[in-house]
Amino acid sequence: MGGKAQFIRDFILKGPVRRTVPIEPVEPSTSGSIAWTSSESGSAHSSRVSSSPITPRKSAETEETLPTCLVRARGSSSAHSCSAATTSQQSNRQSKEHRIGGIKKEEKPIEMGGGSSENGGANGCSNGDNHHVLLMEKQEKIEPKVFRKRWVILVIFMFLSGSNGAQWIQYSIIANIISDYYKVSFQAVDWTSMIYMLTYILFFIPAAWLLDKWGLRLSVLLGALGNCVGAWIKLLSTHPDSFWVTFVGQTIVGASQMFTLGIPPRLAAVWFGPDEVSRACALGVFGNQLGIAVGFVLPPLIVSNGSVEHVTYDLNTLFLGSAVLNTSILALVICFFTARPAVPPSLAQVNALEEKTFDNNFWGTLRKLMTSRDFVILFITYGINTGVFYAISTLLSQMVLSVYPNETETVGYVGLLIVVAGMAGSVVGGFILDKFKKFKLTTIMIYLFSFVGMLSFTLTIDLDSMVLVFINAALLGFFMTGYLPIGFEFAAEITYPAAEGTTSGLLNASAQIFGIALTWLMGIVMHGFGTFTSNIIMSSCLVVGTILTCFIREDLKRQKAHSVQCTIPTSETQLTSCTLQQNEHF
């Protein structure tokens, strides 16, 4: 590949990162070969001694070259043994120290006996069901490190996710005005919201594969580009006969969601330390919720009912502001968003990088996830809770205006309160998880209070009191929206080391499936049988979700990986053993 082409490829996949001088491979000895290279990301490396040269394997996301693992447990009951060739007694003992992106490596020759042993011991290593052993000739001093830039990365993503969320609800919250202006039905207006869900269901698997294969930057870049293009197309739709144009623009923006919706847990794991990861994930979700809050408030304030000319002017203002904002965010992503830090922020991330190198089978991971009992239950319960939230958000204007017909602007504030309370719930939930690590208990309690909030909202909306509507909207939003990042983190724990982007992508797909089904069905029920009936059905769904959550087993595999134990027996053998508590991860 030419120099310019390689530079462009690296810039797209990794961003504006500093290049490091690669370390040349160590020359092989007569009895064995030692091979290792440095990576631009400074990730942990493993190496081995063998009778033949080592074939490195490449990880596309980081463009790092890593040797194949010496021993890899696959869940069989039998142990696997390995042996290393005897090195020359006259080999050079002078150690060399390199610093690669904050990771120190000391090269020392290995003196080991030949042969192997089934049970391990001095001359070999074994591998059983519950652990695997990495044999390395170099002592690695890996010091996980977090960088201040992680906050810049997180804030840029929050702006991107927020700009996408704001456009999701901008038509539905003024459904009566949009319906009159474009001369379309309320169901057509509802589809401007549901198209987000439909495009995600159709394309989330390719998007999850893209994130797993090529990393954060490319996914975020495509999401920002789609937001920008769709926003400018919608600016061309400010004419009563142009609903199809605005729908095309909204479809492009909705499709862009598939590149960003599953990012928060992946970004948190890649950039943040073990004591920050839940909060970082919560803040990533917080950005999307903040955008939805803006989508609830700004359209009713900017676009008011009136003549065709008046509505045209207001829509122009709304769409132009959105287009300029999304163009600015695209520029920020291009200039400042990088794929990963130079050094992994946690031991779990170091191990995840090695797992990705050894087992880079996206479809195999997908199959394992969908055959995991605990993940399948979480897949269903997450979809129920989030689907109910999507249905309420889309139908909120029609729910409230059916009882309070003159409160068009107030509806926007009700939606704002739901989302703002939910943002607070997301952050509080993240702090609780980081502090106490009680994932299952926290999930059950939030699910239970989501049901209480929904039931209270259902029973008070007809009491002719907007104060009660606001109070119950806050209660509903705090718990229901606060559930979103907690579900992501719970999934990351019980499926570790599966890529966080894959697990969150599946959870979001479940949310879109339930969301589109509940929005469509509850819209029919609401217009046919009334708001009370539709809300009771959604409350019943939350009861089912709460009960199902109790059957999820709390096996926090990622927390175990944070405390992985590494021992270096002697400087003579340089035999490094890393023992994990669990090998069959999910």
UniProtKB/Swiss-Prot annotation:
<protein>
    <recommendedName>
        <fullName>Uncharacterized MFS-type transporter C09D4.1</fullName>
    </recommendedName>
</protein>
<feature type="transmembrane region" description="Helical">
    <location>
        <begin position="191"/>
        <end position="211"/>
    </location>
</feature>
<feature type="transmembrane region" description="Helical">
    <location>
        <begin position="151"/>
        <end position="171"/>
    </location>
</feature>
<dbReference type="GO" id="GO:0016020">
    <property type="term" value="C:membrane"/>
</dbReference>
<feature type="transmembrane region" description="Helical">
    <location>
        <begin position="243"/>
        <end position="263"/>
    </location>
</feature>
<feature type="compositionally biased region" description="Gly residues">
    <location>
        <begin position="112"/>
        <end position="123"/>
    </location>
</feature>
<dbReference type="InterPro" id="IPR049680">
    <property type="entry name" value="FLVCR1-2_SLC49-like"/>
</dbReference>
<feature type="compositionally biased region" description="Polar residues">
    <location>
        <begin position="28"/>
        <end position="37"/>
    </location>
</feature>
<feature type="transmembrane region" description="Helical">
    <location>
        <begin position="283"/>
        <end position="303"/>
    </location>
</feature>
<feature type="region of interest" description="Disordered">
    <location>
        <begin position="80"/>
        <end position="123"/>
    </location>
</feature>
<feature type="transmembrane region" description="Helical">
    <location>
        <begin position="441"/>
        <end position="461"/>
    </location>
</feature>
<keyword id="KW-0812">Transmembrane</keyword>
<feature type="region of interest" description="Disordered">
    <location>
        <begin position="17"/>
        <end position="64"/>
    </location>
</feature>
<feature type="compositionally biased region" description="Basic and acidic residues">
    <location>
        <begin position="94"/>
        <end position="110"/>
    </location>
</feature>
<feature type="transmembrane region" description="Helical">
    <location>
        <begin position="513"/>
        <end position="533"/>
    </location>
</feature>
<feature type="transmembrane region" description="Helical">
    <location>
        <begin position="413"/>
        <end position="433"/>
    </location>
</feature>
<dbReference type="GO" id="GO:0097037">
    <property type="term" value="P:heme export"/>
</dbReference>
<feature type="compositionally biased region" description="Low complexity">
    <location>
        <begin position="80"/>
        <end position="91"/>
    </location>
</feature>
<dbReference type="GO" id="GO:0020037">
    <property type="term" value="F:heme binding"/>
</dbReference>
<comment type="similarity">
    <text>Belongs to the major facilitator superfamily. Feline leukemia virus subgroup C receptor (TC 2.A.1.28.1) family.</text>
</comment>
<keyword id="KW-0813">Transport</keyword>
<dbReference type="InterPro" id="IPR020846">
    <property type="entry name" value="MFS_dom"/>
</dbReference>
<keyword id="KW-0472">Membrane</keyword>
<feature type="transmembrane region" description="Helical">
    <location>
        <begin position="466"/>
        <end position="486"/>
    </location>
</feature>
<dbReference type="Pfam" id="PF07690">
    <property type="entry name" value="MFS_1"/>
</dbReference>
<feature type="transmembrane region" description="Helical">
    <location>
        <begin position="317"/>
        <end position="337"/>
    </location>
</feature>
<keyword id="KW-1133">Transmembrane helix</keyword>
<feature type="compositionally biased region" description="Low complexity">
    <location>
        <begin position="38"/>
        <end position="52"/>
    </location>
</feature>
<dbReference type="GO" id="GO:0015232">
    <property type="term" value="F:heme transmembrane transporter activity"/>
</dbReference>
<dbReference type="InterPro" id="IPR011701">
    <property type="entry name" value="MFS"/>
</dbReference>
<feature type="transmembrane region" description="Helical">
    <location>
        <begin position="218"/>
        <end position="238"/>
    </location>
</feature>
<feature type="transmembrane region" description="Helical">
    <location>
        <begin position="375"/>
        <end position="395"/>
    </location>
</feature>
<dbReference type="InterPro" id="IPR036259">
    <property type="entry name" value="MFS_trans_sf"/>
</dbReference>
<feature type="transmembrane region" description="Helical">
    <location>
        <begin position="536"/>
        <end position="556"/>
    </location>
</feature>
